[in-house]
Amino acid sequence: MTNFKCISLLLAIVLVSLILNPTFAHNPKHNRPPRDPKDCPPPIPKKPKPPRDPKDCPPPQEPKQDPPPPEEPKQEPPPPKEPTQDPPEEPKIVTPSNEPEKPTPFHNLYIGYFSIVIAFGDSYTDTGNAQYMGSITITTTESSSSPYGSTTFGKKSNRLSDGRLVIDFITDALGLPTLPPYKETKANFDNGVNFAIAGATTLANDLFSKLKRIFLWKGTPLGIMTELDWYKKYQIDQLCKGLDQKACAEKLKTVLFWVGEIGINDFSRAVGSKIPLSSIAKSSVTYTVELVRTLIRNGAKNIVVQGLPPLGCLPLDISITPLSLRDRSGCSQIVNAAVVIHNQILQAKLELYRKLFPDVTIIYADSWKAFYAIRNNPQKYKIQEVNKTCCGFKQDDMNFNLQSLCGASGTSICDDPSKYISWDGIHPTESMNYHMTDQYINHQCCNPPFQELMKKKAPK
């Protein structure tokens, strides 16, 4: 009985348990006591990604924020461009009353490197000596209605062109006023002087007076040695006045000596005569070389010497050269062959002087190369006429007649001189002078390069 009671009690306990937890009997896997969250965490379902802790890992990768790129120079508005690149306005040039107020790309390009320019040469460089001495015929520059100087100066300019010469562009590049002619009595020579004489020759004056080829000049032409005599006097009386030898030598370092084309008149007067042009070439260059040597002996340290352009391409020489003696481009073969001889001798002599006087900078300005660079590619320079003259006798070939030169009765002026190489059949237009200067300064038509003049000097 007692056993029966015990068994009945045990069964009652089991029955109560089944009623309270019915799943216990059906799923043996769950025959475990329920988890207490304090004792252990719930099982991790197939490695779910744990939530990010901002302290432990980076935020979701926004476009990769690598180390911030080095700050590009803060893109503030770009700085104003240097004045050399298209300035908004061209500065006004302060010029003496006798100068044109027309700025050029050369203006002040090398300002401060030289304080004085002294020039020699012929009508391609003369700014008034021949005019002041009365050695130019009346049809050129004496009349107030003269076409000479009309493009730039608008009045008598004392220049044998419609405007500026190469030497005018050179002084403009150096930031200096135009050069007054030595024969202008009231001129200020503080920044230089021009000794060039239109019509000047290198050979004996009486030789050419016998040939009776006067062209634009009256009487017997003066020689290049006259210019040298003027310079010697000027150096003593003005340039180095009151200075001892050392101080004079120092002052001469600030001077640029410009020796323009010399010999053009020798060739022009001799063409068609019995004098061989090759002899003229060899003889005339001797005087140019002597001029350079004398300048060096007198203390010159910076010298530019212009060679001759192809004179056989001037309307003057073409007009007196038979067709059979002209080359394919219409130029005089004989004249140009002689010019080549002249230039070769001149360059060889200058090279010798560079070796003998290493402290002197001697530049050869290659006028032959510069001229052909322009003539052979006229469209590039907006030139339409390479053989015709702008101012001359329209009824003749090339608008040129030796008996009716520019300014004479019956002559006329072209509408736009900038489209012509030749102004009057002998002298270049201002436009051509500008392009020649550009070739010297910017296009390797100087040997050594024009910039060599500035290497030994610092602008003041």
List PLM regions with ranges.
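Conserved active-site regions of diverse hydrolases
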Residues: 2-38, 46, 82, 86, ...
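Long, intrinsically disordered low-complexity tandem-repeat segments
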Residues: 33-92
